[in-house]
Amino acid sequence: MAAMTAAAAAPAMRLFNPSTFFQTLRTQRFGVPALNFAVPAAAISLLPSIPSLLEDIWEGILRAVPKKKTSHMKKRHRQMAGKALKDVTHLNRCPACGNLKRMHHLCSTCLGKLKGFMDRNGGSNAKAY
C-alpha cells in the first residue's frame, strides 16, 4: 500500500502531451517552427502606453488638415486648366501657294479658293474637304 501511495504522490508521467504534439505536427506539416516566446516585463515597461501613442497619432491627423477652405476660384483654375498644348512640329509649305500647312492636310487658303471656284461655276455635287 505504501508503494501505491508513493506512486500516487509522485507526479504521473504523461505519455501524450498535447501542446508538444501539435507543435511538432505544425513543424512537420509546414516546415516552419512554432513561434512561442515570452516577452520580458522590462521590455513591456519600456513601450509607450496606448493613450500617449494615440495622442501622438491624433496630433498628426489634426495637423494634416488644411487651415482654410479652398476657394471657388482656385478650384475652377485647377479643374479647367487642362493639359499643356503640344508643339506642332509637322509643318511644311504648300506647293501651290507657298503658305505654311500641316503635313498630310489640305492648305486652308487653297481649299477656300477651290470652294469659291466651285460655287461660282455651277456648284456641282462634288465636295472638297
UniProtKB/Swiss-Prot annotation:
GO BP terms in the entry: translation
InterPro entries: Mitoribosomal_protein_bL32, Ribosomal_bL32, Ribosomal_zn-bd
Places the protein is found: Mitochondrion
Keyword annotations from UniProtKB, A to Z: Metal-binding, Mitochondrion, Ribonucleoprotein, Ribosomal protein, Transit peptide, Zinc
Keyword Hydrolase: no
Primary localization: mitochondrion
Ligand binding (Zn(2+)): 94, 97, 107, 110
The keyword Membrane belongs to this UniProt entry's keyword annotation: no
Post-translational modification: MRPL32 precursor is processed by the m-AAA protease (composed of YTA12/RCA1 and YTA10/AFG3), which cleaves the N-terminal transit peptide. Cleavage by the m-AAA protease takes place prior to assembly into the large subunit, an essential step for mitochondrial ribosome (mitoribosome) assembly. Proper processing by the m-AAA protease is dependent on the zinc-binding region within the tightly folded C-terminal domain of MRPL32: zinc-dependent folding halts degradation initiated from the N-terminus and triggers the release of mature MRPL32.
Gene Ontology terms, MF aspect: metal ion binding; structural constituent of ribosome
Transit peptide residue numbers: 1-63
GO cellular component, one term: mitochondrial large ribosomal subunit
Subunit structure: Component of the mitochondrial large ribosomal subunit (mt-LSU). Mature N.crassa 74S mitochondrial ribosomes consist of a small (37S) and a large (54S) subunit. The 37S small subunit contains a 16S ribosomal RNA (16S mt-rRNA) and 32 different proteins. The 54S large subunit contains a 23S rRNA (23S mt-rRNA) and 42 different proteins. bL32m has a zinc binding site.
Functional summary from the UniProt entry: Component of the mitochondrial ribosome (mitoribosome), a dedicated translation machinery responsible for the synthesis of mitochondrial genome-encoded proteins, including at least some of the essential transmembrane subunits of the mitochondrial respiratory chain. The mitoribosomes are attached to the mitochondrial inner membrane and translation products are cotranslationally integrated into the membrane.
Homology family: Belongs to the bacterial ribosomal protein bL32 family.
Protein name: Large ribosomal subunit protein bL32m
